[in-house]
Amino acid sequence: MSWAALLALAVCGILLSVSLIDAETQTIPDRMNLALAVCGAVSVLLSPADWLPHVIGALCVSVPMFLLCLVIDGAFGGGDIKLMAAAGLFLGWQNTLLAMFFGIVFGGMYGIYLLAAKKAGKKDHFAFGPFLCAGIVIAMLFGGPVLEWYCAFL
């Protein structure tokens, strides 16, 4: 098994743990985000020529999320922001944007369901980490083909 495959397997394990913990507690432990960031750093070390897209990936979603939190209280949790920074280091900027897109779509659909079923109100919060994790896994496994398909329309 290649190092890249082992790293992807480790990332999937971390994301599964993050999803389960966040769904139950609405918190993402820093140690999980740190483990994901270590996987990102290892992936950069395995292909050092491609380091810049990974650094941009760590910032391209997490910084706007942080800035949005400064404007809208509670827009995202700190764990969500750190999760996307760590995932961005692993994924690179293009797949990080794709992961965020899928996370927002999945989380938005769940939020609409909660509102429609009257299980939550507009001011209620729910764990967003599991949806971000789903987006990260999709981007990690299918990012290339999805981006190629999308770019064919441009």
Predicted features and spans:
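Short, structured coil/loop segments at alpha-helix boundaries
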Residues: A4, T25, V137-I138, F142-G143
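Functional transmembrane core segments of multi-pass inner-membrane proteins
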Residues: A4-Y110, W149-L154
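Hydrophobic cores of alpha-helical transmembrane segments in multi-pass inner/ER membrane proteins
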Residues: V11, F106, L132-L141
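Helix-loop junctions at the membrane-solvent interface of multi-pass transporters
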Residues: L45-L46, V71, A116-A117, L141-F142
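C-terminal transmembrane module of polytopic alpha-helical membrane proteins
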Residues: I138, G143-L154
